[in-house]
Every structure is written in C-alpha cells, then in structure tokens.
Amino acid sequence: MDRKMLKSKIHRATVTGADLHYEGSITIDKDLMEAADIIPYEAVCIWDVDNGSRFETYAIEGERGSGVICINGAAARMVAPKDLVIIASFVNMNNEEALKHEPKLVFVDDQNRMLPARKEVAGQGTLKKVAW
C-alpha cells in the first residue's frame, strides 16, 4: 500500500506579492526551496492562514536570499500581500518508508528568513485564537 505523506513545508511564510497577470505558479526564494527540498515546477499546496484559501500550484525559483513568496496568475486573487501561508509538498511512499519518514519543516520569521530547525508541535501551540 502506498501512502501520501507530507514531504516538506514552509510554515507561516509572509506573502510578498500577488501578480495576477503572470502565467501561474508561486515564486519562492531559492534558499527556502532548497531547505524544503522543493524543486522548480514541483506541485505544492498553498494554505492561507489569514483567509482560509487552499489551492495547488507549482513552484518556481525566486532570487536567493530575497525572501520572495509571490503568488502568480489566477491564484493571486486568493491571497493578499502580507498574508501568512503554509507551502506544502507531498510524496507517495510505501508503508515501510512512510513509517520511518520525517518531513522537512522550514520555519521562517516575518521577513521569510529561516529560523533554527525544530520539530513541529501538535496542539494549540502559542498562536492567538481566532474569533469567529
């Protein structure tokens, strides 16, 4: 049996731009792509923390060290600059591989600079509660 597993994610990155008239994709700082093991044209899921939008696109390399996270094409209507997003990639693997798998987790600050590596913490964490 194969399982679809989280391969990597860039957690709570700040959107730096939204370019409606570009052909599509998400432009990601090359340093962040390498840290998250995402290659050009790889499919990624984007989850907007601020408005709940969820969509899939593909990654293209942005300038190394720039902190760029730019949503391109039609998906630009689903985000706004300064929104926080989670960028996730997935991989299929057999059950034996899946049981040993550790995803690459990339945490960033509000300028999309990498923070020290750490394990993901389950539960409520320290985030503010959302008032509905």
Curated annotation (Swiss-Prot):
The modification Pyruvic acid (Ser) is found at residue 25. InterPro entries: Asp_de-COase-like_dom_sf, Asp_decarbox. Transmembrane segments: none annotated. Pfam families: Asp_decarbox. Pathway: Cofactor biosynthesis; (R)-pantothenate biosynthesis; beta-alanine from L-aspartate: step 1/1. GO terms for biological process: alanine biosynthetic process; pantothenate biosynthetic process. This is Aspartate 1-decarboxylase. It comes from Geotalea uraniireducens (strain Rf4) (Geobacter uraniireducens). The lineage of its organism: Bacteria, Pseudomonadati, Thermodesulfobacteriota, Desulfuromonadia, Geobacterales.
